[in-house]
UniProtKB/Swiss-Prot annotation:
Its EC number is 4.2.1.3. GO terms for molecular function: 4 iron, 4 sulfur cluster binding; aconitate hydratase activity; iron ion binding. This is Aconitate hydratase, mitochondrial. Transmembrane segments: none annotated. It is linked to Infantile cerebellar-retinal degeneration: A severe autosomal recessive neurodegenerative disorder characterized by onset between ages 2 and 6 months of truncal hypotonia, athetosis, seizures, and ophthalmologic abnormalities, particularly optic atrophy and retinal degeneration. Affected individuals show profound psychomotor retardation, with only some achieving rolling, sitting, or recognition of family. Brain MRI shows progressive cerebral and cerebellar degeneration. Optic atrophy 9: A condition that features progressive visual loss in association with optic atrophy. Atrophy of the optic disk indicates a deficiency in the number of nerve fibers which arise in the retina and converge to form the optic disk, optic nerve, optic chiasm and optic tracts. PROSITE patterns: ACONITASE_1 (PS00450), ACONITASE_2 (PS01244). Residues 1-27 form a transit peptide. Residues 551-560 have a biased composition (Polar residues). Its cofactor is [4Fe-4S] cluster. The gene is ACO2.
Length: 780
């Protein structure tokens, strides 16, 4: 391999030199660091301003806030083609964040790139591998023991390549980012679909797969299809039991799980000022559930207040100077506009099984009775990256305190997940944690826990029909506890707390009464709590590891016999031929999320070992042939068996295969394992009615063909026993459909067209076998 300096020169020549943001204007102002942890990495609003002005002159129209931040980070603002929903933008993100479940594969890919240091500030956050069993400290100790090999790999890889490392117990990635790294106008990418949480602090924060993160860490311009912009105008003000969570629950009901695909959701209007900064983060966080690229709020005094309280008053002061670039222009155009009067917004609860099935809390009991959903609530769970702020915990404690005053405790089991060590320490100091314990709650570790399926649930048997209510973001079938009969509903933390006290979905805290131990009836008053502590936050324990200045002696070891970690082998290049006689591994019926494609929960321990985790490929998807999960016909033996076993059989016998999917295939998590696994086991194409954004990109990155039916009705022409030939790959060009020949067992054939969204760069990924392979080609 060529020397590192030569490789970098070649990469820069081929892909564009990273613009290090220095301008004479900045010299006249005090430099402000991006974070306390990176004192030599500065915020460069001057370059943002310069790029915005270039684009504004070109487009000659008012700009949305989303456009200002995105176009302000263009690699070449003077010549970049800009057309919403069509052109691919080459961007220069400010930083990268990775959680431990996705960081393993991202760092393994970065190691494979041959580069010696990350080109932008980057961090790893240990939050996904801690299973909830009995409570915080014990669960954390157990996780450190079980996951020692993975934590050691991530810590040493971070030290070797210049990546900050947040140790297990530090908190959930998105809360840590909000407290320390997000700021107005930042462009941040994260290997988690809820990265948009940072939009609550006025940043464009986008969830991506690990391969995208590798590009940015390598200093390569990052590609994003120019997003459309959906405006949500907020009027009135929140009050009573209505909360920020109800805004996004309402929006999800309007837009559905795919209504935001390819768009940034931009909140604006006079109602914004009635929402706290962390409340805005809640709304942006759950924007992932409508398929949005990200969501964002304009910079205002609530953000300034939060920045100051988290020790970043210097950033707030700098943002004040550039505020015109951190809010939308008057008269800017939105591709779609939704208006919500916050004064009329009622508390909502969404579910079960999908986050866009919205109900007012006042009506969900009647709907549940009609649908036959279990009314009794077995467990109420508050916290998660969506709702674990100081204000969230305070409002829940305010509800709990009223019940305790009347001698009541929860009828349901009740758990609390602090979002970070800082939140945990502060709610302990200020008494909120004890109030919630007194109600019957168990405080879990500062981690994702049950929200992502890390829950060793003991109170039910698998297959037992039951209801849980959470303040989380997703409620897909089996997501929280691997039980397909758990009816999970998402709502605000204070509503979860009230429902856990009552123990039933039929309870409406706005109108219904509870009976105290003295026999007297009382009604819960709407909770009120401070959005931020009156004093300073308590930082708690120090859980951050700085990368050393000199990492030349740092080693990163991956044992060849490890069951948790595995160095990556490059995928084969395209052989230059059309794809002939592809076997159909599975024709999926209905919803197929990344949880269905690559389950989390007990499988998280294999996130760094591609071959082992591939044993969960599509085990949650429903086979249209028999209506069952993880049961497909082997076309050779004609026997039904698990999906991964069948895929391995095909791979062993040189049979290439394809998956047929329905609408919004791959919605949910950003996990790129859902793309790596089919590629590893011999898949060549995924053909669907439509894709979720992140998953479609992840498939392209790994050399697969994500294709969509030109006519969605053609989905019905394909049967699981057919074979498919995909033609036109020799002339594979942007915008030109590919031809698919369907070969039926009776000898008849049909020809259909398949669309794609590949651009020239992405076609090169396919030809090279993967984006990582293409990166290596450019180094030679």
């Amino acid at each position: 391999m060529a020397p590192y300096s030569l490789l970098v020169t070649r990469l820069q020549k081929a892909l564009g030199v990273r613009q290090y943001h220095v301008a004479s204007v900045l010299c006249q102002r005090a430099k402000v660091a991006m974070s306390h942890f990176e004192p030599n990495e500065y915020i460069h609003y001057d370059l943002l301003e310069k790029n915005i002005n270039i684009v504004r002159k070109r487009l000659n129209r008012p700009l949305t806030l989303s456009e200002k931040i995105v176009y302000g980070h263009l690699d070449d603002p003077a010549s970049q083609e800009i057309e919403r929903g069509k052109s691919y933008l080459r961007l220069r993100p400010d930083r990268v964040a990775m959680q431990d479940a996705t960081a393993q594969m991202a760092m393994l890919q970065f190691i494979s790139s041959g580069l010696s240091k990350v080109a932008v500030p980057s961090t790893i956050h240990c939050d996904h591998l801690i299973e909830a069993q009995v409570g915080g400290e014990k669960d954390l100790r157990r996780a450190k023991d079980i996951n020692q090999e993975v934590y050691n790999f991530l810590a040493t890889a971070g030290a070797k390549y210049g990546v900050g490392f947040w140790k297990p117990g530090s908190g959930i990635i998105h809360q840590i980012i909000l407290e320390n790294y997000a700021y107005p106008g930042v462009l941040l990418i994260g290997t988690d679909s809820h990265t948009p949480n940072g939009g609550g602090l006025g940043g464009i924060c986008i969830g991506v797969g690990g391969a995208d993160a590798v590009d940015v860490m390598a200093g390569i311009p990052w590609e994003l299809k120019c997003p459309k912009v959906i405006g949500v105008k907020l009027t009135g003000s929140l009050s009573g039991w209505s909360s920020p969570k109800d805004v996004i629950l309402k929006v999800a009901g309007i837009l559905t799980v795919k209504g935001g695909t390819g768009a940034i959701v931009e909140y604006h209007g006079p109602g914004v000022d009635s929402i706290s900064c962390t409340g805005m983060a809640t709304i942006c966080n759950m924007g992932a559930e409508i398929g949005a690229t990200t969501s964002v709020f304009p910079y205002n005094h609530r953000m300034k207040k939060y920045l100051s309280k988290t020790g970043r008053e210097d950033i707030a002061n700098l943002a004040d100077e550039f505020k015109d670039h951190l809010v939308p222009d008057p008269g800017c155009h939105y591709d779609q506009l939704i208006e919500i009067n916050l004064s009329e917004l009622k508390p909502h609860i969404n579910g079960p099984f999908t986050p866009d099935l919205a109900h007012p809390v006042a009506e969900v009991g009647k709907v549940a009775e009609k649908e036959g959903w279990p009314l009794d609530i077995r467990v109420g769970l508050i916290g998660s990256c969506t709702n674990s702020s100081y204000e969230d915990m305070g409002r829940s404690a305010a509800v709990a305190k009223q019940a305790l005053a009347h001698g009541l405790k929860c009828k349901s089991q009740f758990t609390i997940t602090p979002g970070s060590e800082q939140i945990r320490a502060t709610i302990e100091r200020d008494g909120y944690a004890q109030i919630l314990r007194d109600l019957g709650g168990i405080v879990l570790a500062n981690a994702c826990g049950p929200c992502i399926g890390q829950w060793d649930r003991k109170d039910i048997k698998k297959g037992e029909k039951n209801t849980i209510v959470t303040s989380y973001n997703r409620n897909f079938t089996g997501r929280n506890d691997a039980n397909p009969e758990t009816h999970a509903f998402v709502t605000s933390p204070e509503i979860v707390t009230a429902l856990a006290i009552a123990g039933t979905l039929k309870f409406n805290p706005e109108t219904d009464y509870l009976t105290g131990t003295d026999g007297k009836k009382f009604r819960l008053e709407a909770p009120d709590a401070d959005e931020l502590p009156k004093g300073e936050f308590d930082p708690g324990q120090d859980t951050y590891q700085h990368p050393p200045k000199d990492s030349s002696g740092q080693h990163v070891d991956v044992s060849p016999t490890s069951q948790r970690l595995q160095l990556l082998e490059p995928f084969d290049k395209w052989d230059g031929k059309d794809l002939e006689d592809l076997q159909i591994l599975i024709k999926v019926k209905g919803k197929c999320t990344t949880d269905h494609i690559s389950a989390a929960g007990p499988w998280l321990k294999f996130r760094g070992h591609l071959d082992n985790i591939s044993n969960n490929l599509l085990i949650g998807a429903i086979n249209i042939e028999n209506g069952k999960a993880n049961s497909v016909r082997n076309a050779v033996t004609q026997e039904f068996g698990p999906v991964p076993d069948t895929a391995r059989y095909y791979k062993k016998h040189g049979i290439r295969w394809v998956v047929i999917g329905d609408e919004n295939y791959g919605e949910g998590s950003s996990r790129e394992h859902a793309a790596l696994e089919p590629r590893h086991l011999g898949g060549r194409a995924i053909i669907t009615k439509s894709f979720a954004r992140i998953h479609e990109t992840n498939l392209k990155k790994q050399g697969l063909l994500p294709l969509t039916f030109a006519d969605p009705a053609d989905y019905n022409k394909i049967h699981p026993v057919d074979k498919l030939t995909i033609q036109g790959l020799k002339d594979f060009t942007p915008g030109k459909p590919l031809k698919c020949i369907i070969k039926h067992p009776n000898g008849t054939q049909e020809t259909i067209l398949l669309n794609h969204t590949f651009n020239e760069t992405q076609i090169e990924w396919f030809r090279a076998g993967s984006a990582l392979n293409r990166m290596k080609e450019l180094q030679q």
